[in-house]
Amino acid sequence: TMARTLTSFGVKLTAIEFDKRTIVEIVDNLVHMIEIDFDRRYDLMSDFGSSVITDQDGILTTCFAEHSFLLSLLKAKDQGKRFKVFVPETRPYLQGARLTAPSLVELGIETALVTDGMAGHLMANKIVNRYMTAADAVAMDGSIANKIGTLTNAVCALHFQIPYHAFAVSPD
C-alpha cells in the first residue's frame, strides 16, 4: 500500500542530490499529503458505511476492520442508530479480541465477542444481518483477500442473503 501511495504521488528521489534538511522537508511534506489523502478517503468510506447501517442492525466483522469501519460505526451511532457489533476472536493472533472489541467498547458501541465458528449460527438465526470487514488486498477486478475466516463468513452471508461490505483504500 505504501509503495502504491508513494507512486501515486509521483515521488522519485533517485539520483538527485539533496542535503539532509531538504530530504527531511520533502519527506515531512509527503507524509502530511498522504495523511490528508488517507483521512479524506477514510471519511468518504465511513460516510458510505454509516449510510448502510440501519437501526437495530446486528453487524459481524472479522479481525480489525480498518479506521473507516470504526468511523462508520461512530457516525452511525452519532446519527442515533442503535446496533450491536459481533466480533469474532480472530485466531490465532486474537486481533478481534485484542484490537477490535476493545476499540468498539472504548467508542461506546455495543459489542459482543464471539468465537470464530459462530458466524453461521448468528446469521442463520437472524442475529446478524450485515457483514463488514477490511480487505488486506484488493485485486483490480474487485475481488478481495482478507484474514482466515473471511471467506467462510462471506459464503454464509451470501447463503443467508446478508449484505457484505469490505473496506479498502484502493486496489493493490
How should these model regions be labeled?
Residues 90-172:
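Conserved phosphate- and dinucleotide-binding cores of soluble alpha/beta proteins
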